[in-house]
């Protein structure tokens, strides 16, 4: 009788251990499944891109999503000299300028400050040493160009190693790159651009340049043009952005 009792207790303990082991295995499998099924967090770049819109590839990859324009700026474009030329395409009668005339031109370059911001610097230096001279690097490191605007880095395109920035204010707002020079606005008696009646009409992208057509409305004082009597002057403008040669690159590394 004693032998039978001991065998029964031993059998009972073995079954209990098996149930515990099976429970542990089941919990482990459930935990692994939960890890696999956890969705990947969407990046800021993916959030913007999934909205669709138009994509144009050239000097920069340009995205037109809803009413905003974005550039994808690769690291290879940082420090490159870019020429921005603004011309009148349509003007009021007796305005003092004619369609086709150049309004102004500016040379600028992009500089990455950190992971959140790209600076736009206007190149205004007039003292340039000869290429290869020792003084050239010293001159570039001891002088500084003005920051005319900044671009917030919204996201990053891992495939092209490019930074996504919104450029709508660059072409629509009171931007130093595309706005008329202060001296010209003074002579034409123009005030600040009116945001609600200033538009980006088209943006066309090519391998070496980008062409932007805008309609710009300025507050105006009484001038020689009859249109100024309304308090506003509306202009048709074309902005041409193109890269300069490789020799014209601003030195940004020590």
Tell me the role of every PLM-derived stretch:
Residues 12-254:
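Auxiliary tRNA-acceptor-end handling modules of aminoacyl-tRNA synthetases
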Residues 1-16:
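Bacterial Sec-dependent N-terminal signal peptides
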